[in-house]
Amino acid sequence: MTAEPPQSDRSLLHVSGLDAGYGEMQVLRKVSLDVRPAEIVAMVGGNGAGKTTMLRAISRLIPSRGKIHFNGRSLARATADDVFAMGLVQVPEGRQLFDRMSVEENLRMGAYRRRDADGIAHDLDRMYAIFPKLAERRSQLAGSMSGGEQQMCAMARALMARPRLMMVDEMSLGLAPVIVDLLLDTMTKIRNEGVTVLLVEQDVHAALSVADRGYVMETGEIVREGSARALESDPEVQRAYLGDVTGAT
């Protein structure tokens, strides 16, 4: 029998043999992945690869088969609310803000389970420091903001829950490159403060530019995994997702 790995080497999120889908349509096939504490892991692949389905299964929003462990605990019997309470929080594709509520009201919704008023006030100030645009817009209706500002609000709302793991779905979708770069820089700062990130992205270059490790998903299966730098230099990944990078500087 092998010895238990030291605590620092254990995964915060461990997924093994995950199958999931919708009704009779199977989308995921034997998906396995690990996310260790205080790292950014990218799950990349094209539209329809199954990445969002994977997040929904991990969040217990859809039924699945296989093993999911978070912080050493099985999620087999967990509800979506249980998962949120454990500190596994999702930033959904399309932001899904409360459009007719103010920015600050949206942020407070992220802290709806919390009862520490002083801590919530402190975290609101922290979110406004991380995302200065939100401080300017705190009383504005969330639905009236630009796409980039809405993505900032969605990320800040998730952080108000004080997550251990933040799963971000298609952060770059529909955003200008300069806004994507700003959000990626912010994600790195968040990771450096101890929040683990699982980033699901079609923009492979953007995701791998900030990730420590990555996985490539195609038609519901993991087809490649490794360090972000190794995936960036993989000829098959370059050909399929990064275009002609020959001679790039």
Sequence positions of predicted segments:
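Glycine-rich phosphate-binding loops of nucleotide-dependent enzymes
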Residues: 2-249
